[in-house]
């Protein structure tokens, strides 16, 4: 995040607004207006920042970067995973007739990511000689370290990786009809 902010400052004037305890930096990257924020750890922080970006800054897309744990033996440390969709691996109300990961009142369990954003990110990764994978991102407010839990997330959700914010951003963007990419 600091590198993005430094790059913005070299290219344009940057203003900073603090909302809900988070610093939102407005500026330009390569001529494109952007807002950069570090949401912090967890689903609530992520959803909060996504909603502020959408309502206070009129974001027309939301892109999240961060660290995830691989659930696929073909994804290595340093590789990039571009979301095809995102799912909350903690949400479980199957006893009420919902799919694993599905939030009551929402018709889908997995929130589709923007194919346009994914293709743009894939092209950028290739130019930077990064190994990029496409797959489902599973999120939950828990650090997943036990092999049994990793296998459950991979088997039940078909996830490529897991982390702690993406599905909250995805759900917020889905409900607000804003394209996103994790």
Locate each region found by the language model.
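A glycine- and small-aliphatic-rich helix-loop capping segment at beta-alpha/alpha-beta transitions
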Residues: 7-14, 55, 76-87
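N-terminal short beta-loop-beta anion/metal-coordinating cradle
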Residues: 1-51
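Alpha-helix C-terminal capping segments
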Residues: 52-57, 74-75, 171-179
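A C-terminal functional module that forms or caps the active site or interfaces directly
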Residues: 143-182
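Short glycine-/acidic-enriched loop or helix-start segments at secondary-structure transitions
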Residues: 3-5, 47, 72-74, 91-92, ...
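Proline-aspartate-enriched helix->loop->beta-strand connector
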Residues: 58-63
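Mid-sequence, gly/pro-rich, charge-dense loop/helix-turn segments that line enzyme active sites
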Residues: 71-157
